[in-house]
């Protein structure tokens, strides 16, 4: 008989503990949801800020591309001039050898 009287007590304790845990889980899920919303807003703001720099990045890219093009052209011109000088020196040596 004592088992039957203690059984409702155990059930009540279990139900109270279950309800407390469910409430705690619910509170924690609400906190997680709030934090996810905050994170989402922050990511959206970061994306917007990044978009504001697209024009600046494009401008710098154009600048660097132009500078690289100038450097490449300068190297080609220098190489062509060196080849002309080298071939001119070779012709002078050949002419001197003939004399």
Curated annotation (Swiss-Prot):
Keyword DNA-binding: no
Region of interest called Disordered, as start-end residue ranges on this chain: 69-99
GO biological processes: cell division; filamentous growth; mitotic spindle organization
Keyword Ribonucleoprotein recorded: no
Role of this protein: Component of the DASH complex that connects microtubules with kinetochores and couples microtubule depolymerisation to chromosome movement; it is involved in retrieving kinetochores to the spindle poles before their re-orientation on the spindle in early mitosis and allows microtubule depolymerization to pull chromosomes apart and resist detachment during anaphase.
Quaternary organization: Component of the DASH complex consisting of ASK1, DAD1, DAD2, DAD3, DAD4, DAM1, DUO1, HSK3, SPC19 and SPC34, with a stoichiometry of one copy of each subunit per complex. Multiple DASH complexes oligomerize to form a ring that encircles spindle microtubules and organizes the rod-like NDC80 complexes of the outer kinetochore. DASH complex oligomerization strengthens microtubule attachments. On cytoplasmic microtubules, DASH complexes appear to form patches instead of rings.
Name by which UniProt lists this protein: DASH complex subunit DAD1
Organism, scientific name: Candida albicans (strain SC5314 / ATCC MYA-2876) (Yeast)
